[in-house]
Amino acid sequence: MVGTMPLCGRRAILEDSKADGTEAQPLVPTGCLMVLLHWPGPEGGEPWVTFSQTSLTAEEVCIHIAHKVGITPPCLNLFALYNAQAKVWLPPNHILDTSQDMNLYFRMRFYFRNWHGMNPQEPAVYRCGFPGAETSSDRAEQGVQLLDSASFEYLFEQGKHEFMNDVVSLRDLSSEEEIHHFKNESLGMAFLHLCHLALSRGVPLEEMAREISFKNCIPHSFRQHIRQHNVLTRLRLHRVFRRFLRAFRPGHLSQQVVMVKYLATLERLAPRFGSERIPVCHLEVLAQPERDPCYIQNSGQTAGDPGPELPSGPPTHEVLVTGTGGIQWHPLQTQESERGNSRGNPHGSRSGKKPKAPKAGEHLTESPQEPPWTYFCDFQDISHVVLKERRVHIHLQDNKCLLLCLCSQAEALSFVALVDGYFRLTADSSHYLCHEVAPPRLVTSIQNGIHGPLMDPFVQAKLWPEDGLYLIQWSTSHLHRLILTVAHRNPAFSNGPRGLRLRKFPITQQPGAFVLDGWGRSFASLGDLRLALQGCSLRAGDDCFPLHHCCLPRPREISNLVIMRGSRAHTRPLNLSQLSFHRVHQDEITQLSHLGQGTRTNVYEGLLRVGGPDEGKVDNGCPPEPGGTSGQQLRVVLKVLDPSHHDIALAFYETASLMSQVSHMHLAFLHGVCVRGSENIIVTEFVEHGPLDVWLRRQRGQVPMTWKMVVAQQLASALSYLEDKNLVHGNVCGRNILLARLGLEEGTNPFIKLSDPGVGQGALSREERVERIPWTAPECLSGGTSSLGTATDMWGFGATLLEICFDGEAPLQGRGPSEKERFYTKKHQLPEPSSPELATLTRQCLTYEPAQRPSFRTILRDLTRLQPQNLVGTSAVNSDSPASDPTVFHKRYLKKIRDLGEGHFGKVSLYCYDPTNDGTGEMVAVKALKEGCGPQLRSGWQREIEILRTLYHEHIVKYKGCCEDQGEKSVQLVMEYVPLGSLRDYLPRHCVGLAQLLLFAQQICEGMAYLHAQHYIHRDLAARNVLLDNDRLVKIGDFGLAKAVPEGHEYYRVREDGDSPVFWYAPECLKECKFYYASDVWSFGVTLYELLTYCDSNQSPHMKFTELIGHTQGQMTVLRLTELLERGERLPRPDRCPCEIYHLMKNCWETEASFRPTFQNLVPILQTAQEKYQGQVPSVFSVC
């Protein structure tokens, strides 16, 4: 692997370092491992450490060095070992053979730009703040500083070395302006370097400059450039630098300020700093509906079958990994690929230009010849990673997969360790993505229920719920110390976790034993120690601490070990307190044959009429609807709630609301709810081959285990998606798994969909819950929604996995209710499969303690380990054939479901994209031009597609691809399906508080700030074009009027005529057809007005302005509206709108464009306002 961080060496020999990182090395004793350091620690000493133990892991070496240098446990995971000779980073579990001479380098590998907060244009980076501080708008209160003092010092020394060894090189610059800028910045960096030395040694700056030449503090390429000048030029440069030093008085600067300025300038000067670029021999983005990247080739594949030949040859693509930008990739140019991407040079290519750091979705190039970067994912989107030899699969929660083939197995391990490290730092500190790079200490911690080095407020939050809780954690200050923490509740502080007084008892690690200080007994494992402590009490002085229950680490816990990068609204769980689903009219459905009974429901096959009158064909060969009504007919399943159970209709609707707000290819699609007289009907998709348990029983003894494991993987994928959203299915079992594709033919895989749970657990009687044993989790027998959690679904998954293994026969099915209940009471174990690996997996899922059950990410990771032929099947195609483009959609596979809405020139509809025509498609939103559009509109349509394909932001609707029809010469835009529709349609029908409206407004500003940063103006920002993904997340859509602002210009002048949303336009747009960035701010003000009026049609901008100007048409409307706005008339204050919010609207409606705030300015203002009104009832709002 080629890391962009150059190699490190001794500070004493920096002046002789080469640009490629190869420098003179200290003499290595024979049979010894030497690790070189950038900084030896506060005590000084030699900048290297030697090891002579027989066998060590890379993690053990890092821990030893961190202890020597003074790096604290929370920062340990930022560091790793680099092998200069092999040019790879070592994964933490790599076993080092110290019998051979070896030089390694201890470096900070995991880096997050703007961790110092000096650049307001980039996301703030900080560790998660203390519980209860999230509502603060002050970053200092919001989060914890990323680095400790030793890590900061080490990074500074590492950054100095990288700068002087040409992480950004003068040789890569071409224009005089770039060279001049580089020289000035380099001299400034040299000044900061000398300032730091002077402050640390306590000597005057001029004296330090006489002792150390500034040329020793600038890049190697700059030094060589200076040597080429004549003596007079060099002397003049020395004098200029010394005059600058004499004129400057650094008394107000501290060492810390100097170090921060140095690193912040280095980030700006060298965009590659802190990133890694990895050349790969082969890259594919796999969309699972087209090519299922599972790990069996066909149903007859055996574990011993060899995999396909791995691609070889020069690199074809390059992958970019950064802490703030996630994973991106681009193809390599031919000449670069032929050179192997300069693999012998640890820097790769360099650039002295100053582009922004790559962020999610940005297509950034460092040179005009370099292809743009394509965004793949952020680390928290990853579900699991599979590594086999040189091939890596990165699987996402939405089932997309990145397939990479690296140049060597060592590079593959290095790359996976990089992705895994960033995942643990940003998503889940107690989970690893891949066994092959699992940190040994983390594996031990998971096995023994040990928390990471949590700070006290997070410990207090975990111990607060009840008395008798305790936890075991790694110390926050000592790398080799474990601590048992208990809490004493202080009656004087009873309102929160801060009222707990913590007491810590160290646990000493001895060879093969653990000893709790103050207790003479030793234990072979922490599990044995926990078992012995159960029910005991610890006494310290006059205090007595009962130990009833040990708090174990949980998936995705928020703590100081998780690093936040700006606002992450999409991590908030869905709020299901308000029902939301599509209503199906009773005339649109036809009830057909009865399929059976569910819990309090009757299930029928049916037909759902969708589409317009020109689509009168019938899907899947079904007969047309009686009466001859036109439109396409879809086969559906009708789940009819028995009218006698009208008392649980709300629970029935809650199920429909849950399934309507989620979208995953392995979840059955819910079309909506129909009320037919006294009947309540859920209308869901029809899946061809029906329930899995019935099919398995029919095929008893004929289905191979590999087939079953693919099904298990797909089920775990769907449940992992729900777990990430903190949603509980509550009824995972074989009868609710529907088989869409059999996958028995060679080259195919099965495809399943998890159906809706039916009537929710909370509405079931105890008898019904007992009847569902063994799928019902033990904690759910008592009833109530408080017992429902994601661990409930894990128990159901374990029981279903047994059901799949046993050909559809579930355990305990022959027993009566009392026997089943007694089975749970006695905590008996369900029967296990004969495979030891499968037995271990099901045992973990079916533990009676919910906190001890693993996460679905863990299950997905471990399921891949059960299949030795990991890569077989994903590459069972001609290696010479080009990879299919996942952004190309074919019209024949698009099945229309219903219309979603219309814009000025286009129409948006919901489609199912089903290329295999077997019910495995995904729901997408497709936008097409209306008929009769002229060439001018078609040209604008192409521009909209080109704009949207370059954007990637959490508050902008995602581009999926295009569908071209060569016959009709038309292009359809395919986007993600946003289930809840536009704010214009949503707000009038739902009760939304002011704080939530302000959150929407803040998110709109964040999306628009990103759009403006990409040099686009929207020109059609309105509530109708803001889509609601869930009740905490909005996305901007409809870029039909968007324009790119030419470089160096402040506005775009529109010359074409067309239908325009004039009531949302600023005066300069109406009068001069000039569209500034500030023109979008005006439109935002009108959009904010719409939000505060709840999109009431009687108070719409169109209605209000029409009342003021009278009914007019065409240009007369524009003329009168312009005159009205120039007189200072504005939309009135909405009812119950706070004064400061209406004042903010009026700021957005300033006549002079330059007086309006920017979206960047609006974000913190709205965030502060949102926090102010969070939790307040309407009566306390400060209205005018």
UniProtKB/Swiss-Prot annotation:
One GO CC annotation: plasma membrane
Gene3D superfamilies: Phosphorylase Kinase, domain 1, Transferase(Phosphotransferase) domain 1
Enzyme Commission no: 2.7.10.2
Residues binding ATP: L900, G901, E902, G903, H904, F905, G906, K907, V908, K927
SMART domains attached to this UniProt entry: B41, TyrKc
Chemical reaction(s) catalysed: L-tyrosyl-[protein] + ATP = O-phospho-L-tyrosyl-[protein] + ADP + H(+)
InterPro entries reported for this sequence: Band_41_domain, FERM_2, FERM_domain, FERM_F1, FERM_F2, JAK, JAK1-3/TYK2_PHL_dom, Kinase-like_dom_sf
Disordered as annotated region, ranges: 294-368
Residue span(s) of domain Protein kinase: 589-866, 894-1166
Residues with PTM Phosphotyrosine: Y295, Y604, Y1051, Y1052
Active site: D1020 (proton acceptor)
Highest rank taxon of the organism: Eukaryota
Molecular-function GO term, any one: growth hormone receptor binding
Protein name: Non-receptor tyrosine-protein kinase TYK2
Natural source organism: Mus musculus (Mouse)
